A protein has these predicted regions:
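NAD(P)+-binding Rossmann beta1-loop-alpha1 motif at the extreme N-terminus of oxidoreductases
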Residues: 1-37
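Rossmann-like NAD(P)(H) cofactor-binding subdomain of soluble oxidoreductases
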Residues: 16-20, 32-102
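Internal alpha-helical scaffold of NAD(P)-dependent oxidoreductase catalytic cores
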Residues: 15, 22-25, 102-185
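Structural signal for conserved beta-strand scaffold positions within catalytic alpha/beta enzyme cores
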Residues: 28, 71, 89-90, 111-112, ...
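Hydrophobic anchor at the start of a short beta-strand
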Residues: 3, 26-27, 67, 88, ...
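Interdomain hinge/lid region at the active-site interface
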Residues: 180-234
Length: 234
């Protein structure tokens, strides 16, 4: 396929080589200027941040109202395209992306929506895990991903800050992090949960909470998560 990739952020940086490796002809376009945007392609992929999506779509579709456009956002409905183009859909790769570390796209779950068969064909050319999903269900999928990825990584950052404050290296946590992730491949997360909160060891919880008294925001997070873990364990 001839694919126009609009955007040069983290996702687009990973999409470009994945599309090329799958054998597609790719034109990469800067979303801020749209300079050199072709008038025709098999599919236009809009891979920009959610807050810029509507503006980019409104500009990119001008004169291309019969072209196929897809966006890559997990929490934005497909209906955003209505009134801009007659052929549209969603191509949502559910993964955490960084410019510095390219992922193996063949293992990335891709969730598609839309009537045009080219959308699924594009996804299947790049990934072994392709699923049809409506906008209504996709917003809950994205929400669940925020808990599983973004919040988990934030806890890593909090752990790193705490260790640094006391002169300890973060890499001592890596075996623990790796084993925690491996366990949920074979166990339900509730069954994999360990630590003082799951058994509600009040003495340990109270002591650890007190250690955070000089950082009330972190103490609040600790107390809230401990209570949530305890309630889920009951």
């Amino acid at each position: 396929m001839r694919v126009v990739l609009i955007g040069r952020g983290r996702l687009a940086t990973n999409l470009l080589p994945a599309l090329q490796e799958a054998g597609h002809e790719v034109v990469s376009i800067n979303s801020r200027t749209l300079e050199g945007l072709p008038t025709e392609a098999d599919v236009f992929v809009v891979a920009v941040k959610d807050s810029a999506l509507k503006d980019v779509i409104s500009q990119a579709t001008k004169g291309r109202e019969q072209q196929l456009f897809v966006h890559t956002a997990g929490s934005i409905p497909m209906s955003l395209f209505e009134g801009y183009t007659s052929r549209y859909g969603v191509f949502y790769p559910m993964q955490t992306f960084s410019k510095e570390r390219l992922v193996d796209f063949a293992e990335v779950p891709v969730f598609v929506e839309g009537e045009c068969p080219q959308i699924r064909q594009l996804a299947e050319s790049m990934s072994h895990r392709v699923y049809a999903l409506s906008s209504e269900h996709r917003k809950y999928l994205h929400l669940a991903a925020v808990f599983a990825c973004n919040f988990a990584n934030h806890c890593y950052a909090l752990s790193a800050e705490l260790l640094e404050k006391h002169g300890l290296p973060f890499d001592v946590m890596l075996p623990l992090i790796d084993e925690t992730a491996r366990k949920v491949h074979g166990l339900h997360p509730l069954d994999a949960q360990t630590g003082p909160a799951v058994r509600y060891d009040e003495n340990v919880i109270r002591l650890q909470s007190a250690l955070l008294s000089d950082t009330p925001a972190l103490q609040e997070i600790y107390d809230l998560l401990s209570l949530s873990i305890h309630r889920k364990a009951q």
